[in-house]
UniProtKB/Swiss-Prot annotation:
Residues 79-82 are annotated as: Involved in Mg(2+) ion dislocation from EF-Tu. PROSITE patterns: EF_TS_1, EF_TS_2. This is Elongation factor Ts. It comes from Metamycoplasma arthritidis (strain 158L3-1) (Mycoplasma arthritidis). The gene is tsf. It comes from the Bacteria.
């Protein structure tokens, strides 16, 4: 049976699928729109599976705050162009709402959270089939503030860097300023205690035996040691010792103290970090596309 032109147009508009795919779907389902959509979904999963070996290293990362919940996630695509596609943005917005409303312990559990009757993983596969690029939820983090705690987050304008934080206290605006600092300076560690013990011990021992301390009164020695440790930990990128980006006359630790905040945890994502991007032979890629 030849496809009905009106139904062909409707199917394309509802699914954003290609003309030939829609034609085949209608022919296979006797021009039944709903069955044709299901046919496209079933065949779309196959197409998505063929794309599973591709590397998705572009995309967005978002921080989302709702009441006492902070969610951070990275949604990947293969190209920056697709990451600006409205369908991709719509999916990201649905994911943020779903992750905020549901518990998850790791990325596998996050991908099983449901939106619109499908898991996040299935929704990514569905969008992969529609736009032709591999879409994946790569990672996600969630902080839930207890009474006496506060959460905050920051997403940079290009959505390539975002972070969330949780602290004891109530000043959310001040904590948000700290998340802006974290996004900008990308500290290597949050606290001195986060440094590997061997590295920390080496620094302390080296400073304690510094010749400049010789013959100095004890109080002056302690002051000099504190200054040298502060300088060393700042150079190593420890957040608490970094000059606060909005007021560099004080450290982040001092800024938090002034605002009655005690930082508990923070997480920062940058799109594609840790992913090895594949260098593609364009001629080979074209040849491969011609086989499909």
């Amino acid at each position: 049976m030849s496809p009905d032109l009106k139904k062909l147009k409707e199917l394309r508009e509802r699914t954003n699928s290609g003309l030939l795919d829609c034609k085949n779907a209608l022919e296979a389902t006797d021009n039944d729109i709903e069955k044709a959509i299901k046919w496209l979904q079933e065949n779309g999963i196959i197409k998505a599976a063929k794309k599973s070996a591709r590397i998705a290293a572009e995309g967005i990362t978002k921080a989302y705050i709702k009441d006492n919940v902070a969610v951070l996630f990275e949604l990947n695509a293969e190209t920056d162009f697709v990451a600006r596609n409205q369908l991709f943005i719509d999916l990201a917005n649905k994911i943020q709402d779903a992750l905020a409303a549901n518990d998850f312990s790791d990325i596998e559990a996050a991908n099983k959270v449901k939106i619109d009757g499908m898991t996040i993983e299935e929704s990514c596969q569905d969008l992969t089939a529609k736009i032709g690029e591999k879409i994946t939820l790569r990672r996600a983090e969630k902080f839930v503030a207890k009474p006496g705690e506060v959460v905050a987050g920051y997403t940079h304008a290009n959505s390539r860097v975002a972070d969330i934080a949780i602290a004891k206290g109530a000043n959310q605006e001040a904590l948000r300023h700290v998340t802006m600092h974290i996004a900008a300076l990308n500290p290597s560690h949050l606290f001195e205690s986060c440094l590997p013990k061997a590295q920390h011990d080496e620094i302390v021992n080296r400073i304690n035996s510094d010749p400049k301390l010789a013959n100095k009164p004890e109080k002056i020695q302690e002051s000099m040691k504190a200054g040298m440790l502060k300088k060393e930990f700042n150079e190593l990128g420890v957040l608490m010792f970094q000059p606060f980006v909005m007021e560099d006359s004080k450290t982040v630790a001092k800024y938090l103290e002034e605002n009655q905040l005690t930082l508990l945890d923070a997480t920062r994502y940058e799109v594609g970090e840790g992913i090895e991007k594949k260098v593609v032979d364009f001629a080979a890629e074209v040849a491969e596309q011609m086989k499909q």
